[in-house]
């Protein structure tokens, strides 16, 4: 039941705030309403909205991540792809994309996202 809720919840109830646009033109958003801190970690949803459809027709991807702000690293807890922009339409979960180990993003787009979520300054994200 939880699985269905996670992957089929509507993005219309989220507060998606733009964080950064990549060199490819893809845009990255974080749901500012669902950022949570628990047990020394931060948990958040993010969407990558593709400028152009992927070869399989996906227009966006959505992930739920666990962040470690002290060590500047993250884990992917769930991952899905969508046939509509902004995580809309039917979600197709991709468990093989899950990373069991922590990943250090450095100065990549993932690093910009994690830094924004961890800093809580998020002038571009928070109201």
Regions found by a protein language model. Name each.
Residues 1-6:
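Bacterial N-terminal signal peptides
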Residues 10-64, 68-127:
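N-terminal secretory-pathway/extracellular module detecting exported/lumenal segments
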């Amino acid at each position: 039941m939880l699985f269905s809720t996670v992957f089929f919840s509507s993005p219309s109830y989220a507060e998606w705030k733009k964080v950064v646009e990549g060199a490819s033109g893809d845009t990255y958003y974080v749901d500012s309403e669902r950022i949570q801190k628990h047990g020394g970690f931060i948990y958040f949803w993010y969407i990558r909205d593709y400028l152009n459809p992927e070869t399989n027709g996906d227009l966006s991807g959505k992930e739920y991540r666990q962040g470690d702000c002290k060590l500047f690293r993250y884990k992917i807890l769930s991952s899905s792809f969508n046939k509509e922009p902004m995580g809309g339409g039917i979600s197709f979960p991709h468990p093989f994309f899950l990373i069991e180990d922590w990943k250090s993003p450095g100065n990549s787009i993932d690093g910009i996202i994690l830094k924004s979520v961890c800093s809580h300054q998020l002038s571009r994200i928070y109201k």
